[in-house]
């Protein structure tokens, strides 16, 4: 193998080793910050040598990107799970939106430190920013397809769904991160749902 040639693991043990590096590296970066974490620390946390890390990853940025791919799936796709397995119509959309908001809030709580670190990096790292933009659009299209399959109006649906996603995302950020004491979150949830129902 050439120096600095990146391996793609095939055997189960090697795959597990790579996954351990991703998990350990991602958790460390989210805990300490990207610029306060080095590859040697990631190797120690994963229980491997630094050389092993460099067999699978060019640098800690590659580890972070792989971690973000897993984190993004955990954050985005629970919202889709709420909608994908049941019949949706105007009569039960209120109920579905409440479940979606609850799922989104819980995922933000579970990944609060990770979310804060990653969101800060979307402003300075083009690759990470592009990854999140692509995921947002993919989620918009997936939810739009689910609504279309259930008979909802197709007119401006991508735009409507994208606005709805951001309303829910902003609401979750308020509940999990900002926590303004003068705001009633039950009222805010009702207002978000009411507005989404009005334009979907």
Q: What are these model-derived regions, one by one?
A:
Residues 2-6, 50, 61, 67-71, ...:
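Alpha-helical bundle regulatory/interaction domains
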Residues 83-84, 105-127, 173-178:
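Amphipathic alpha-helical segments used for helix-helix packing
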Residues 21-29, 104, 168:
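Short hydrophobic clusters on alpha-helical segments that form packing/core surfaces
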Residues 73-81, 95, 102, 106-110, ...:
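Amphipathic alpha-helical packing segments from all-alpha helical-bundle domains
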Residues 16, 20, 28-62, 66:
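Helix-turn-helix
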Residues 41, 91-96:
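A conserved beta-strand->loop->alpha-helix hinge within the catalytic CA
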Residues 1-16:
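N-terminal intrinsically disordered/low-complexity leader segments
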Residues 116, 148-195:
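Hydrophobic/aromatic-rich alpha-helical bundle segments in the mid-to-C-terminal region
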């Amino acid at each position: 193998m050439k120096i600095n040639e990146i391996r793609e693991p095939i055997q189960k043990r090697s795959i597990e080793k790579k996954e351990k590096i991703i998990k350990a590296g991602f958790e460390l970066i989210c805990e300490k910050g990207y610029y306060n974490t080095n590859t040697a620390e990631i190797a120690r946390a994963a229980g491997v040598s630094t050389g092993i890390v460099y067999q699978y990853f060019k640098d800690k940025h590659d580890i972070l990107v792989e971690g973000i791919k897993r984190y993004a799936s955990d954050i985005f796709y629970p919202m889709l799970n709420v909608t994908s397995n049941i019949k949706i119509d105007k009569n039960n959309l209120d109920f579905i939106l409440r479940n979606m908001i609850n799922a989104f809030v819980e995922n933000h709580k579970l990944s609060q430190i990770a979310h804060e670190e990653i969101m800060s990096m979307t402003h300075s790292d083009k690759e990470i920013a592009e990854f999140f933009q692509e995921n947002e659009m993919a989620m918009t299209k997936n939810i739009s397809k689910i609504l279309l399959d259930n008979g909802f109006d197709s007119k401006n649906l991508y735009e409507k769904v994208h606005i709805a996603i951001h309303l829910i995302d902003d609401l979750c950020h308020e509940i999990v991160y900002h926590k303004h004491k003068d705001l009633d979150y039950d009222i805010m949830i009702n207002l978000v749902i009411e507005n989404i129902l009005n334009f979907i």
